[in-house]
Regions:
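N-terminal pre-core extensions flanking Radical SAM catalytic domains
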Residues: 1-73, 90-93
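Radical SAM/AdoMet-radical enzyme domain recognition
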Residues: 77-105, 110-157
């Protein structure tokens, strides 16, 4: 992955003056990046995870991988259906969203179609980013992620 030299620039906002001008005119600019939570299940049960706190709808859906697999099979409402994800990705690409970040509420890679969703993101010309605990990597996923912008592994998970 190639690192953008301006990624940590204190003047990062200046790189997006067109968006600032849209705000000034009262317009709603298209987001540069969209975060997509495709699953609110996780194969870990980290005591420090904010999503486990009381009040979160997903706080009872964290645990051992076998239990999570059972929840996936018994409760498909715990993740966005594949077809809906494709629709969201297509809409984002059509609007001109630059990057798609697959992130938490759970572990994105427990979604049975995460590999296809990551590839579809790249095929649509958007940058791919992922926040993961890195423990559910299906065959071919590392090669897809190598084409992405960044991957953040939660090493404390």
């Amino acid at each position: 992955m190639k690192t953008d030299p301006n990624v940590y620039s204190p003047y990062k906002g200046a790189h997006h003056m067109d968006k600032i001008q849209q705000f000034k005119k009262g317009e709603q600019p298209i987001p540069l990046q969209v975060q997509l939570i495709i699953a609110d299940l996780c194969n870990h049960n980290c005591s420090f995870c904010a999503y486990r706190m009381e009040g979160y709808t997903s706080n009872k859906n964290f645990g051992e991988w076998d239990a999570v697999k059972q929840m996936i099979n018994n409760n498909p409402n715990r993740m966005i259906p594949y077809e809906k994800c494709i629709e969201i990705l297509d809409d984002c690409a059509e609007m001109g969203v630059k990057a798609l970040q697959f992130t938490g509420g759970g572990e994105p890679t427990v979604h049975p179609k995460h590999k296809e969703l990551f590839q579809h993101t790249l095929d649509k010309g958007m940058d791919l980013a992922l926040v993961t605990n890195g423990t559910v990597m299906r065959e071919g996923v590392p090669e897809i992620l190598a084409q992405g912008k960044w991957v953040r592994f939660s090493v404390d998970a």
